[in-house]
């Protein structure tokens, strides 16, 4: 940006591009080339200049450049971007100021930039009409493409289109050049699309290619051109492509997992799905004779039986005839069966034979790897998987349910949600980046503006004026608001105005937010050094670096800046304190240009800002970060307040005045800029839309205003809305005349009321102001629609207008915050989704057209393959609408059935490709993006801040008034009573007053302390007490004044930081001690409530402390009764000191110790499990098993007695108060009551009563008692209970949302689903035979006028229907009925009402996608909030599991292990070296993969030869793996069995060898051994560590490992829910009629079957089928007198209400809650795992550290000698690696050494880690934690106390050297003295020799010391000071001290 300023922006910057310009460019390029070779090495990619992002081609010219002179529009201009100064380019600007960049070389080698032809081409290209023309062409073309059989004349239209496209491309090629240089035609990927489309068009036209329709489909790509034309779409497509890139890892993992599962499926179920029930051939056939021989297996090669009697029976033909198989009614495929005991059985007269093809046209099977893979993909996407599940269980046996459980939970839930997590993160990152970029631009523009202003001021203003203006600009940036006309002169006024208006709001927000934001905020993170350089240039233009901010040093200014920051609203929930540390580092670069004092001041300022940001509830941003006007207004006020306070001193006063004047100016300008319309419109509005005629009118107006604006009127209107909704919901079929007339009158009345409200409001407010408010416009529209509907009520076909009345429901949003928020969220995401929806529409359109073009014909020609009547089925692709419906259905996740049809008619490959593309692109990516957007607009702010202002809305005011009134009346009555009866109320009052007082004083006392704490400075010299203080204050409030939370919700969140999360971890000890005293003083405080808004909890006591406290508790049970009881009945309290009281007390103590004993608890848990297990036996066979029945009856009694005893014990031990205040105890109490009641009833002989029977079913709740006993489940339940309020809120809103659709459905379809059915065949009559109800009646008994089971006859039924549509289960039948419906009492006709499909499409988009995903949003959001409450730990985990989790997170607890010693034997040694090399490992992995490949090749019907080959290959593998095992055993000796993987390998090898010899035997009794080979694939996980590229996949697996504990708990809870529902289902639905989804295998007859059914519904699959038979309530649907042999129960009718409740509640609990919790956990852990992997140090680095360590410390002493340290550091991998020469760095690390110059591994690890991460508080915390762990795991370290450190040692050595040197010098001097004394006596010789000798000595000494010196001095500088920016001075000084001292020593 700064370089752009070289050419001053404004009109002067545009220069026409001429020959001279070209020459100049060439000259510059040549100069650069000459310079380049020297510099080439220095320039990294990072620091190369980059093109300016504001001046990219395609963007609009920045406002700063002003208007383009008219003569320069569409002309070649010199490039504005300095980056292109020496590159051959020029730009062209069109009228709309869009930038087009061209290459300045000759296009097509002939057209130079100034060639007239090229100029004309450019003019056409840049003109806006040109792109409009292309756009229209594309759209028209799309319309033509949707025609399924176009008329002949369209051929010519086709030519026209091709012509236009060719013209477009030619223009582009002429203007740009073809492909050689940058910015030419083919350099833009979007142009490739155009080019290929045109080439295809000509090829299909002139070359006869046979299958043209396939090529014609390529024309569809033209629709994609819309993307290249509309600007917003490119970015969305960019985001999509980004997310797909991100998905690569997940995709690889998914494919891998699916392959593994597919292999397992292949091994388990190969060929199973072909088992069918075959009719035993009739006795007269030749078959009977041959049966024996058949079973002896003498079949010849073509399947004919050869027999001695020579009569042949052609078995093959018999099997091939489908009519011999057993087929159920309404099914296409024969019934499957299996030979296992738990598999499906055949009816009498049939046998189970493997024959014929697989189900579903042969496409569902596990026969080859590819089909198995398809089946698993289908399982993963959960499409119609219940069918696959049922088929497989039928054919293979019920035990294989385990396989499906694994695949659904690990494959489906985990992988699909990972995809979601990745997409959401990609979206989030994209968002972050764009936001930061925007902020950076903002800042840069800001700078440029100031620059411009300064230049202009200097140029124009008189000295006095300039002085004044300088004064303005001094005030924290408010001066920037000033823009007078004189300034605008340089920018042509129009563009300036435009620019100003466009950004005024935004800037106002910026300034008033924080007058001076901390520097770090102003330039966000994403900056290359280059931009900093640019900025330095920006500043220096003014001649003084950081010109704008230097003024901060004046005291007033600094005051202002701090104050200003007080008013800055919190950005959004995500900007936490932590972000400041990161930012400050980045700021460093900027502070380089400031002088020292300034930068530190500025810096500490920014730190302080971060702490004192108060939380202002009124100023939450709306989700998309914009600021509402009210907020701007508030903020403006706040800045006034500041200036008022500043008026105290004169300079302040002066400034405040100027602020005021500036603000008024700005306000005026703002008002002007707000006006959207021309002034004449305002004149008109003033006259006609503001009614102030005469006084009497004004009085009327005032009166009306009083009435209409009163809160009670609002309340009344709200009640009317609710009533109106009720009236609309009461419509049903069949309705009596009276009822419908009541509804009609009601509607008229309500319409009247709403019309009156609107008219009165218009009178009161004037139309002009009335229509300024959104809600009023909404009201107006609805009222006018209602009036219109009254007028047009009788017009045929306009009944739809009635549904507009439903929109009235939305008026509730005004007073119902959650609904309002929800509508806002949907609104926001629809806004953000606008582009996305367009992309989705384009994708759907393209695929619909492709499908129609490719498969349309085939559907027509081969229709008999998929439909016996040879009529097109409902789902086909023969025309565009149906094709669109199929694509939409695929987007809903239902692709497999339509794909089978497609594959059957149009061939497998193409269909697979197209459907998979739609599935992957559409479903996975786009819908997930949808979800990501929804979740991102769901920040916790939205939920908490329901209203923009904290004002109460009218409704609340009205209700409050009523409440007050009621309270007043109550109090009056109470007082009368008191006066009458009591004479001493005063005493009590005083007493209460005292109480309150004491509370208050206590409160203030605590706050007092906290205030002192506030200013305890910690080591950093900054005030960290804020955290402490506010958290303490909060506790107090928490304890005493609950109401204050309700009245002032902001209180709960006022703790911006609590102690543990402040930036400054090293708090002083004194502070902590005072904290702890405080805590003691409030022992009652419950730990969980300690700090709701904060993320840090009070530290739990250490284990030792707990142990001491517990025994005290044990001795004393609580009081029996509450204080209230004791007051009323004093005899409840007994003295425990003597007599009976003492005995009672001892009894209680005994009970207490029993109840608290571990064994007691264990015993009770055991009993609970047994009693729950007993319930599972009560299935339909219980009548036949008499012994079991009697046993269960006795057991039941025993259990009941035991539980009653337990309850009594607990009552005595805990007292009623404690027992009945615990929710879990209540649960126990109620469940015991149920057992008690049924026991008593049985004893009295009432057991057959209906009420008692239904009570018995409540025994199913018994397992719930296990909840409180298993911590894992209890944790999850607590989390869930916490989420219930918000889940209920959203549920209510969804119900309201659905209500609208339900009422609409009733309006559209009530009573129209009835149809006439032939009783004998069960099929529907054709309209030609039966037209209406009376025709059907005429046919008598053989016909029946029947309704569809799930219909829209009333609102309740509508809800059920909508639930089926929303879960996509059973929705087809409802949709078919709707589409076929004609009118009430008319026989339906096939697709008569085709466009009713759209009702369902709309509902699915809004009712299903939005509302169901909102649940996910709410649940995730809630758990995040609860997580904050629980101190940032995962709430689904128990303490134990948290430990595991932490261990997983940091494997720092690893201690160095002894490596396996190398064997002494030479041969063994060689083998050992070979085996321990990485190459060996990798080669084994490759072998494993190859082994898998050979397993994949296996198919069901392979030839004998193939089988032989495969078995030989398998043999080879067994030999190889045995070889590996032997080699390892030889070299590793007994150590081989110390490694888990080795044991696994050993088992697999043994099994394989045994399996070779005993294959038949094992397969018969066990699972086939091939399965174990599949498990071997898990070993691949080991190589992931060796591959650098696999980091992403490792992250994903790590996320899974981290989620396991939590997922296990959720799984347990789900199992419990399933268990209860299974028992409930058994007792209610065991005997229903077998039809639809209930049959002989899938039913509720036994516990196992119930579980199988419930597991299937957990994913909401096929619940409609299970519900259907239960909806049969009367004959002829079912038989109430049906007899069930072996049981006394009669009838097979269901109970619809119980059934609906059962299934709906189960679906809501399991699907919405448990499954979504699953999603929440995975999303959470995925983000944690990605953060972990993004951190500079990961687990693997620690592992690698220890692996290298083992080599240097073979005996695992945990110490290493100092001399080896250098080699060790050099042997590590990065990032811990310290390459040689590293002595200096190592010494500087100051490592502690123990005797023998040894260093401990942890110390080294810490020093190295610190080097990577830099100093930080967290580091110390981590260090302590790791040391504790280390000590725990190996106590040996204690004995070695460090005696010195490396740095000390070096200093000692250096010091010693210095001392020695000085001493030598001293000796030398002495010597010289002596010599000089004896000088005279010496000869000349001696005199010459000695000095020489002395010199030599000195030289030697110096020579000695030089390396030392360099070493020492550099050691102090070697570690880079990470905290020069972030740490305040004091600490810096302290840190420097030792370094300076050491320097001093060395000198």
Swiss-Prot record:
Catalytic activity: Na(+)(in) = Na(+)(out)
Disulfide cross-links: 864-870, 902-911, 1316-1336
Expression sites by tissue: Expressed in enterochromaffin cells in both colon and small bowel (at protein level). Expressed in pancreatic alpha and beta cells.
Stretches in topological domain Cytoplasmic: 1-128, 175-188, 236-249, 425-712, 764-773, 817-834, 935-1157, 1213-1218, 1273-1285, 1421-1478, 1530-1539, 1593-1605, 1723-1947
Renumbered ranges of III repeats: 1140-1451
The keyword Transferase appears for this protein: no
Placement of IV repeats on the sequence: 1460-1758
Membrane topology: Multi-pass membrane protein
Residue span, IQ domain: 1852-1881
Annotated Gene3D superfamilies: 1.10.287.70, EF-hand, iswi atpase, Voltage-gated potassium channels. Chain C
Superkingdom of origin organism: Eukaryota
Keywords from the named record: Cell membrane, Disulfide bond, Glycoprotein, Ion channel, Ion transport, Membrane, Phosphoprotein, Repeat, Sodium, Sodium channel, Sodium transport, Transmembrane, Transmembrane helix, Transport, Ubl conjugation, Voltage-gated channel
Comp. bias intervals (Basic residues): 500-509
Localization terms from the record: Cell membrane; Basal cell membrane
Intramembrane extents: 370-386, 881-896, 1355-1371, 1652-1664
Record topology, Extracellular segments: 147-152, 207-213, 270-369, 387-397, 731-738, 794-797, 856-880, 897-907, 1179-1190, 1245-1253, 1309-1354, 1372-1394, 1498-1505, 1558-1569, 1630-1651, 1665-1696
II repeat ranges per the UniProt record: 693-965
Domain notes per entry: The sequence contains 4 internal repeats, each with 5 hydrophobic segments (S1, S2, S3, S5, S6) and one positively charged segment (S4). Segments S4 are probably the voltage-sensors and are characterized by a series of positively charged amino acids at every third position.
Function: Pore-forming subunit of Nav1.3, a voltage-gated sodium (Nav) channel that directly mediates the depolarizing phase of action potentials in excitable membranes. Navs, also called VGSCs (voltage-gated sodium channels) or VDSCs (voltage-dependent sodium channels), operate by switching between closed and open conformations depending on the voltage difference across the membrane. In the open conformation they allow Na(+) ions to selectively pass through the pore, along their electrochemical gradient.
Subunit structure: Heterooligomer of an alpha subunit, SCN3A, and 1 to 3 regulatory beta subunits including SCN1B and SCN2B; disulfide-linked with some beta subunits like SCN2B. Interacts with NEDD4L; could regulate expression of SCN3A at the plasma membrane through ubiquitination-regulated endocytosis.
Name of the protein in its database record: Sodium channel protein type 3 subunit alpha
Organism, scientific name: Mus musculus
């Amino acid at each position: 940006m700064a370089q752009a300023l070289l050419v001053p922006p404004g009109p002067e910057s545009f220069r026409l591009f001429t020959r001279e310009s070209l020459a100049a460019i060439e000259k510059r390029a040549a100069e650069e080339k000459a310079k380049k070779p020297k510099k080439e090495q220095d320039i990294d990619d990072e620091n190369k200049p980059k093109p300016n992002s504001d001046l990219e081609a395609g963007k609009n010219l920045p406002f700063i450049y002003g208007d383009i002179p008219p003569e320069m529009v569409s002309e070649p201009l010199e490039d504005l971007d300095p980056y292109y100064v020496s590159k051959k380019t020029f730009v062209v600007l069109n009228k709309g100021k869009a930038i087009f960049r061209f290459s300045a070389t000759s296009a097509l080698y002939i057209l130079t930039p100034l060639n007239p032809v090229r100029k004309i081409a450019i003019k056409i290209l840049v003109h806006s009409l040109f792109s409009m023309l292309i756009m229209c062409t594309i759209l028209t073309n799309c319309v033509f493409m949707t025609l399924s059989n176009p008329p002949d004349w369209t051929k010519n239209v086709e030519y026209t289109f091709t012509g236009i496209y060719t013209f477009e491309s030619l223009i582009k090629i002429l203007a740009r050049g073809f492909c050689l240089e940058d910015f030419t035609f083919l350099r833009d990927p979007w142009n490739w699309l155009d080019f290929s489309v045109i080439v295809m068009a000509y090829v299909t036209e002139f070359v006869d290619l046979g299958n043209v329709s396939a090529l014609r489909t390529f024309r569809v790509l033209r629709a994609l051109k819309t993307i290249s034309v509309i600007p917003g779409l490119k970015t969305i497509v960019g985001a999509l492509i980004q997310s797909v890139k991100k998905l690569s890892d997940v995709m690889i993992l998914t494919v891998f997992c699916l392959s593994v599962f597919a292999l397992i499926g292949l091994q388990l179920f190969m060929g199973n799905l072909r088992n069918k029930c075959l009719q035993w051939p009739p006795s007269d056939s030749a078959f009977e004779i041959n049966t024996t021989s058949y079973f002896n297996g003498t079949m010849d090669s073509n399947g004919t039986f050869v027999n001695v009697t020579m009569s042949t029976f052609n078995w093959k033909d018999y099997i091939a005839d489908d009519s011999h198989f057993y087929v159920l009614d309404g099914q296409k495929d024969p019934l499957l069966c299996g030979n296992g005991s738990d598999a499906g059985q055949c009816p009498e007269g049939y046998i189970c034979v493997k024959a014929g093809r697989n189900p579903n046209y042969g496409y569902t099977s596990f026969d080859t790897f590819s089909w198995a893979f398809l089946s698993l993909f289908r399982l993963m996407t959960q499409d119609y998987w219940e069918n696959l599940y049922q088929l497989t269980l039928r054919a293979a046996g019920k035990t294989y349910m385990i396989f499906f459980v694994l695949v659904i939970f690990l494959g489906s839930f985990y992988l699909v949600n990972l995809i979601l997590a990745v997409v959401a993160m990609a979206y989030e990152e994209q968002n972050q980046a764009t936001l930061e970029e925007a902020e950076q631009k903002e800042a840069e523009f800001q700078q440029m503006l100031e620059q411009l202003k300064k230049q202009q001021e200097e140029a124009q203003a008189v000295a006095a004026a300039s002085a004044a203006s300088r004064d303005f600009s001094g005030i924290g940036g408010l001066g920037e608001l000033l823009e007078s006309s004189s300034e605008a002169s340089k920018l042509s006024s129009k563009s300036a105005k435009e620019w100003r208006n466009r950004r005024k709001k935004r800037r106002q927000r910026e300034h008033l937010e924080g007058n001076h934001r901390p520097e770090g905020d102003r330039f966000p993170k994403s900056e290359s050094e280059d931009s900093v350089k640019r900025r330095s240039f920006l500043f220096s233009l003014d001649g003084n670096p950081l010109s704008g901010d230097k003024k901060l040093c004046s005291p007033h200014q600094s005051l202002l800046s701090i104050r200003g920051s007080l008013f800055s609203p919190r950005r959004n929930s995500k900007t936490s304190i932590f972000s400041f540390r990161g930012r400050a580092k980045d700021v460093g670069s900027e502070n380089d240009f400031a002088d020292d004092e300034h930068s530190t001041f500025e810096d500490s300022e920014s730190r302080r800002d971060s702490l004192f940001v108060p939380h202002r509830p009124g100023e939450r941003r709306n989700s998309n970060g914009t600021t509402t006007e009210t907020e701007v207004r508030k903020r403006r006020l706040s800045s006034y307040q500041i200036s008022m306070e500043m008026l105290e001193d004169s300079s302040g006063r002066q400034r405040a005045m100027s602020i005021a004047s500036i603000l008024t100016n700005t306000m005026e300008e703002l008002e002007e800029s707000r006006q959207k319309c021309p002034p004449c419109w305002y004149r008109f509005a003033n006259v006609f839309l503001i009614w102030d005629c005469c006084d009497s009118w004004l009085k009327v107006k005032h009166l009306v205003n009083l009435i209409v604006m009163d809160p009670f009127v609002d309340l009344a209107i709200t009640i009317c809305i609710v009533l109106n909704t009720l009236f609309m919901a009461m419509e049903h079929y069949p309705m009596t005349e009276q009822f419908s007339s009541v509804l009609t009158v009601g509607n008229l009345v309500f319409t009247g009321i709403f019309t009156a409200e609107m008219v009165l409001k218009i009178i009161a407010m004037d139309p002009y102001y009335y229509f300024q408010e959104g809600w009023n416009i909404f009201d107006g529209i609805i009222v006018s629609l209602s009036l219109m509907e009254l007028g047009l009520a009788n017009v045929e076909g306009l009944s739809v207008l009635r549904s507009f009345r439903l929109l009235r429901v939305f008026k509730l949003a005004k007073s119902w915050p959650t609904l309002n928020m929800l509508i806002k969220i949907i609104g926001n995401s629809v806004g953000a989704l606008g582009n996305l929806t367009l992309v989705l529409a384009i994708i759907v359109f393209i695929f619909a057209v492709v499908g129609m073009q490719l498969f349309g014909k085939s559907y027509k020609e081969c229709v008999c393959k998929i439909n016996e009547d040879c009529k097109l089925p409902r789902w086909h692709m023969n025309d565009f609408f149906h094709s669109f419906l199929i694509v939409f259905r695929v987007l809903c996740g239902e692709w497999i059935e339509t794909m089978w049809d497609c594959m059957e008619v149009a061939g497998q490959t193409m269909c697979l490709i197209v459907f998979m593309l739609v599935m992957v692109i559409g479903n996975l990516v786009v819908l997930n993006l949808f979800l990501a957007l929804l979740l991102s607009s769901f920040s916790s702010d939205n939920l908490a801040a329901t209203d923009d202002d904290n004002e109460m809305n009218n409704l609340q005011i009205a209700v409050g008034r009523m409440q007050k009134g009621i309270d007043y009346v109550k109090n009056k009555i109470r007082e009368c009573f008191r006066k009458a009866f009591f004479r001493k109320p005063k005493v009590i009052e005083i007493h209460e007053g005292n109480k309150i007082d004491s509370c208050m004083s206590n409160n203030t006392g605590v706050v007092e302390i906290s205030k002192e704490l506030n200013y305890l400075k910690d080591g950093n010299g900054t005030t960290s007490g804020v955290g402490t203080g506010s958290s303490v204050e909060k506790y107090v409030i928490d304890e005493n004044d609950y109401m204050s939370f309700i009245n002032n919700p902001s209180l709960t969140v006022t703790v911006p930081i609590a102690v543990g999360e402040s930036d400054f971890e090293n708090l002083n000890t004194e502070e902590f001690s005072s904290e702890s005293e405080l805590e003691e003083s409030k022992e009652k405080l419950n730990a969980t409530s300690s700090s709701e808004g904060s993320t840090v909890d009070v530290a739990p006591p250490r284990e030792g402390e707990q142990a001491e406290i517990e025994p005290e508790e044990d001795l004393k049970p609580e009081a029996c009764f509450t204080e209230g009881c004791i007051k009323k009945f004093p005899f409840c309290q007994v003295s425990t000191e003597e007599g009976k009281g003492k005995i009672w007390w001892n009894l209680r103590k005994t009970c207490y110790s029993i109840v608290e004993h571990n064994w007691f608890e264990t015993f009770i848990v055991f009993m609970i499990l047994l009693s729950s297990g007993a319930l599972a036996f009560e299935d339909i066979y219980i009548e036949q098993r008499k012994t079991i029945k009697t046993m269960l009856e006795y057991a039941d009694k025993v259990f009941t007695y035991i539980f009653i005893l337990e309850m009594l014990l607990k009552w005595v031990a805990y007292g009623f108060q404690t027992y009945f205040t615990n929710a879990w105890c209540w649960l126990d109490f109620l469940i015991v009551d149920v057992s008690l009641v049924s026991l008593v009833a049985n004893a009295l002989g009432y057991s057959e009563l209906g009420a008692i029977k239904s009570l018995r079913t409540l025994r199913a709740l018994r397992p719930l008692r296990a909840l409180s006993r298993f911590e894992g489940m209890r944790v999850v339940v607590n989390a869930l209970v916490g989420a219930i309020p918000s889940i209920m809120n959203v549920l209510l809103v969804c119900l309201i949302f659905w209500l609208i659709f339900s009422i609409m459905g009733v309006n559209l379809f009530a009573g129209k689903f009835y149809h006439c059915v032939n009783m004998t065949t069960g099929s529907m009559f054709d309209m030609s035979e039966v037209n209406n109800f009376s025709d059907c009646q005429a046919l008598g008994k053989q016909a029946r006028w029947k309704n569809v089971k799930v219909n829209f006859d009333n609102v309740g039924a509508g809800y059920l229907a909508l639930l089926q549509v929303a879960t996509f289960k059973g929705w087809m039948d409802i949709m078919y009925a709707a589409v076929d419906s004609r009118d009430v009492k008319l026989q339906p006709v096939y697709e008569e009402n085709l466009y009713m499909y759209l009702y369902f499409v709309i509902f699915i988009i809004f009712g299903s996608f939005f509302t169901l995903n909102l649940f996910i949003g709410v649940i995730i959001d809630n758990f995040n909030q609860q997580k904050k409450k629980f101190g940032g730990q995962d709430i689904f985990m128990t303490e134990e599991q948290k430990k595991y989790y932490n261990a997983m997170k940091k494997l720092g607890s690893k201690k160095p292990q002894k490596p396996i010693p190398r064997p002494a034997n030479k041969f063994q040694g060689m083998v050992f070296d070979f085996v321990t090399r990485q190459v060996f490992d990798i080669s084994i992995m490759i072998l494993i993969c190859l082994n898998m490949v050979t397993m994949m090749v296996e198919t069901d019907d392979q030839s004998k030869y193939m089988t032989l080959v495969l078995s030989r290959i398998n043999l080879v593998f067994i030999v190889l793996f045995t070889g590996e095992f032997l080699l390892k055993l030889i070299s590793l000796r007994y150590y081989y069995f110390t490694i888990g993987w080795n044991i696994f390998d050993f088992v697999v090898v043994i099994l394989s060898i045994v399996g070779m010899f005993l294959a038949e035997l094992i397969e018969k009794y066990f699972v086939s051994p091939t399965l174990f080979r599949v498990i071997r694939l898990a070993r691949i996980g080991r190589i992931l560590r060796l591959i650098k590229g696999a980091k992403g996949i490792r992250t994903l697996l790590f996320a899974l490992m981290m989620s396991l504990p939590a997922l296990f708990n959720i799984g347990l809870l789900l199992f419990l829910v399933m268990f209860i529902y299974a028992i409930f289902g058994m007792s209610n639905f065991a005997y229903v009629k077998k039809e639809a989804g209930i049959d002989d295998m899938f039913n509720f007859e036994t516990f196992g079957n119930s579980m199988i059914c419930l597991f299937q519904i957990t994913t909401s699959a096929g619940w409609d089928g299970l519900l259907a038979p239960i909806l049969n309530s009367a004959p002829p649907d079912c038989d109430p007198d049906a007899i069930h042999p072996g049981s006394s129960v009669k009838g097979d009718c269901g109970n619809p209400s119980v059934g609906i409740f059962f299934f709906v509640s189960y679906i809501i609990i399991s699907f919405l809650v448990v499954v979504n919790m699953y999603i929440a956990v995975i999303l959470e852990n995925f983000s944690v795992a990605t953060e972990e992997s993004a951190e500079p140090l990961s687990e693997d680095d620690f592992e690698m550290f220890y692996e290298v360590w083992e080599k240097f410390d073979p005996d695992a002493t945990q110490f290493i000698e100092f001399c080896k340290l250098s080699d060790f550091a050099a042997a590590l991998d990065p990032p811990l690696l310290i390459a040689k020469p590293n002595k200096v760095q190592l010494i500087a690390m100051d490592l502690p050494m123990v005797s023998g110059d040894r260093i401990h591994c942890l110390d080294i690890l810490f020093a190295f880690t610190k080097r990577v991460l830099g100093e930080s508080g967290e580091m110390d915390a981590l260090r302590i934690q790791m040391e504790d762990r280390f000590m725990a795991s190996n106590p040996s370290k204690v004995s070695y106390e460090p005696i010195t450190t490396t740095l000390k040692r070096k200093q000692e050595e250096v010091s010693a050297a210095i001392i020695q040197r000085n001493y030598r010098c001293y000796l030398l001097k002495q010597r010289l003295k002596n010599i000089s004394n004896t000088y005279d006596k010496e000869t000349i010789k001696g005199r010459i020799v000695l000095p020489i000798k002395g010199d030599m000595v000195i030289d030697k000494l110096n020579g000695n010391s030089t390396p030392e010196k360099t070493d020492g001095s550099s050691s102090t500088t070697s570690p880079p000071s990470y905290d020069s920016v972030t740490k305040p001075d004091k600490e810096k000084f302290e840190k420097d001290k030792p370094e300076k001292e050491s320097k001093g020593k060395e000198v």
